[in-house]
């Protein structure tokens, strides 16, 4: 299992909109759910640094993740454009081998169909 990890530095006043875009019911997660390889995500807000967020997406296979990005490239670019208006900086932290992941029913775990 892969974990794709991003860090975002969100502009003051854009936090609510950013959280709606990337939250469990947001457009970014909805697009990811269209792939059977998408297993869920964790969306974290830094308590010590205002406006800093981490997004961890869990995918079953790298090839399917890459195919998903290619198949939905127009939609991905549209969402990235929306996000760019809200963030000062986007840092791709990397793609990791997920050794320990949250239970599928934990509060931060988003799954298909909202379950």
Task: Please report, for each region that a protein language model flagged, where it lies by residue.
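Glycine-rich beta-strand-turn "strand-cap" elements at beta-sheet edges
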Residues: 2, 39-51, 77-115
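Short, well-ordered beta-strand segments in beta-rich or mixed alpha/beta enzyme
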Residues: 2-9, 40-70
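Short, surface-exposed ligand-recognition loops at beta-strand->loop->(often short) alpha-helix junctions
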Residues: 9-22
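Non-catalytic surface loops within mature trypsin-like serine protease
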Residues: 10-12, 61, 97-100
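An amphipathic, aromatic/His-enriched active-site/gating alpha helix that lines ligand/cofactor pockets
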Residues: 23-40, 58-95
């Amino acid at each position: 299992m892969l974990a794709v990890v991003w860090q975002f530095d969100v502009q003051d006043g854009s936090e609510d909109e950013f959280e709606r875009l990337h939250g469990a019911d947001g457009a970014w997660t909805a697009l990811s759910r269209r792939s059977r390889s998408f297993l869920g995500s964790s969306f974290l807000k830094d308590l010590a640094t205002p406006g800093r967020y981490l997004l961890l997406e869990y995918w079953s296979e790298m090839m399917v993740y890459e195919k998903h990005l290619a198949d939905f490239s127009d939609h991905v670019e549209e969402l990235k454009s929306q996000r760019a208006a809200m963030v000062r900086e986007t840092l791709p932290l990397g793609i990791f081998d997920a050794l320990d992941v949250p239970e599928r029913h934990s509060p931060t775990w988003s799954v298909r169909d909202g379950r």
